[in-house]
Structure formats: structure tokens, C-alpha cells
UniProtKB/Swiss-Prot annotation:
Keywords: RNA-binding, Transcription, Transcription antitermination, Transcription regulation. This is Transcription antitermination protein NusB. PANTHER family: ANTITERMINATION NUSB DOMAIN-CONTAINING PROTEIN, N UTILIZATION SUBSTANCE PROTEIN B-RELATED. One of its GO terms (molecular function) is RNA binding. HAMAP family: NusB (MF_00073). Belongs to the NusB family. Involved in transcription antitermination. Required for transcription of ribosomal RNA (rRNA) genes. Binds specifically to the boxA antiterminator sequence of the ribosomal RNA (rrn) operons. InterPro entries: NusB-like_sf, NusB_fam, NusB_RsmB_TIM44. One of its GO terms (biological process) is transcription antitermination. Pfam families: NusB.
Amino acid sequence: MNRRKSREVAMRLLFQTTLNGENLEEALENLKDVRESEEITKEKDYESVDLKDVDIDYVKRIIKGIEENKEEIDEKIKGNLKNWKIERLSKVDLSILRLCTYELKFEEDIPNRVSINEAIELAKKYSGEKSATFINGVLGKMI
């Protein structure tokens, strides 16, 4: 199983729920259908993720953990934003920050630098170089 791909799927699910208001339980149920069809919604410049390498249990744990601790995670993010309000963040950046903040706080088996590096890579892929720098700065303040 590939943790990088699993994080990417988790981030996409977080983004999807943030964008359309769907709850995370529904998104996890839909993931089963997505996995069976081997396709995640493709957007311009998004690469498809091969779900056979994705650790679905890890994705579920992350998604459920974020949902259960969302207020605490968002407070941690807010406390490390400089001259920004969480409401102004792009949905992609917010999803990446929530994912990594959860890992930093609750996934003790993952080194902080690995979580932050993965968040930066997700930002480069889905948001842009400036967002990657911004996310690195916010997460760097957390550790």
C-alpha cells in the first residue's frame, strides 16, 4: 500500500466535502463505488490515482479522525496563520492543512517532516508553488 497515494485520496475527499458540503461518511461510502470503478473525478491537470495501491483503511482512519477533531484541527491552523483568516484559504489549501495537521497531532508513527513534505508535494500538485511555500510556513510553526 502506498501512503502518498492514500494521502492524496484523503485530501481529495476532504476537498470534495469542503466544496459541496457532503459529509465525510457519505464521501467514504462513495469511495467504495469509486474504487470499484477505478476512477476519481478528473479535473484539469489532475492525474488519476490508481486506487489498487491505496490503503483504504488508512484513508478512512484519517477522514474519520479529521471529522472527529475538526474544531481542534481548525483552531490549530488558525493559531498558526499570519495575517490570514481560515475562511479566506482556498478549499484545496484548507484540505491539505487539515490533513497534515491531523497527522502531526494524532499520527505519532509518521515523522513530522514526512507529513509536512507530503503536504508540500500535494500543494505543488493541486494548488501551486506559492501555496506550497505558504503551507510549509504554517505547518512549520506547528512543530
